[in-house]
């Protein structure tokens, strides 16, 4: 049966607005079992086509529609409207510059991601086929490779808010450990050297916001803890 959805949406167009404001929007949906992105798509198509947001896969895979939903970061496409208290308050991801409405500038986030060398480094002779792993070695990557780089975790972290140019952030550090833990990679020492800094790694204080908001159920804090353990072991 049809349902009415009430939302309060952060709006800001730098070309015409002096400051941000919250817009009250009401939209009708034909079905009660819908995702938040369905409501936003309906608003953009039928109510206000100036609303700006990122979205793509609608399946929780691309991570592009990450936003702050009722005070908690998440993906609009995997957040069921039935789980949300109305009016639903939507804001852009915190800690990053707002480009327009719910769209943020991800430049700093991806700069930190690229700083950890997010690819295999292996200078040994290339095998005729793939580089093999045992099942146990492969299992070490579970809970790491599934990250979709939506930035929900990093933008929920106070340390990233305060030091986005120095602290790699939960997402970047999770990816750093993903390659450190990979038996095919030969750059562990270099990767640890890259993180040997008062800010890049050790600014994590295990607040656990990153774990709470990850839409894929990953645990960046656990990965960060393992990197810290490796740092301590090589120092003694």
Regions found by a protein language model. Name each.
Residues 23-34:
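Short, contiguous acidic and Ser/Thr-rich linear segments
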Residues 28, 68-71:
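Short strand-turn-strand beta-turns centered on an Asx-Gly dipeptide
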Residues 33-46, 91-236:
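Ferredoxin-type iron-sulfur electron-transfer modules in oxidoreductases and energy-metabolism complexes
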Residues 57-66:
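Short, structured protein-protein interaction patches enriched in aromatics and acidic/basic residues
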């Amino acid at each position: 049966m049809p349902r009415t959805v009430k939302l309060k949406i952060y709006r800001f167009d730098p070309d015409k607005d002096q400051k941000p404001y919250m817009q009250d929007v009401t939209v009708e949906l034909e079905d009660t079992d819908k995702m938040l992105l369905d409501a936003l798509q309906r608003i953009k198509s039928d109510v206000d086509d100036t609303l700006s947001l990122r979205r793509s896969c609608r399946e929780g895979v691309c991570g592009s529609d990450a936003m702050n939903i009722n005070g908690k970061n998440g993906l609009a496409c995997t957040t069921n409207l039935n789980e949300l208290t109305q009016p639903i308050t939507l804001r852009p991801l915190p800690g990053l510059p707002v480009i327009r409405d719910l769209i943020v500038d991800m430049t700093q986030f991806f700069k930190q991601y690229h700083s950890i060398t997010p690819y295999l480094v292996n200078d040994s002779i290339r095998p005729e086929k793939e580089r093999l792993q045992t099942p146990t070695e492969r299992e070490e990557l579970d809970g790491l490779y599934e990250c979709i780089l939506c930035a929900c975790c990093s933008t929920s972290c106070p340390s990233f808010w305060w030091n986005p140019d120095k602290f790699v952030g939960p997402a970047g550090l999770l990816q750093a450990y993903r390659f450190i833990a990979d038996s095919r990679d030969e750059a562990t020492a270099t990767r640890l050297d890259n993180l040997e800094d008062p800010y890049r790694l050790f600014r994590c204080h295990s607040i656990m916001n990153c774990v709470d908001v990850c839409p894929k159920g990953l645990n960046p804090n656990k990965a960060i803890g393992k990197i810290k353990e490796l740092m301590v072991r090589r120092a003694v």
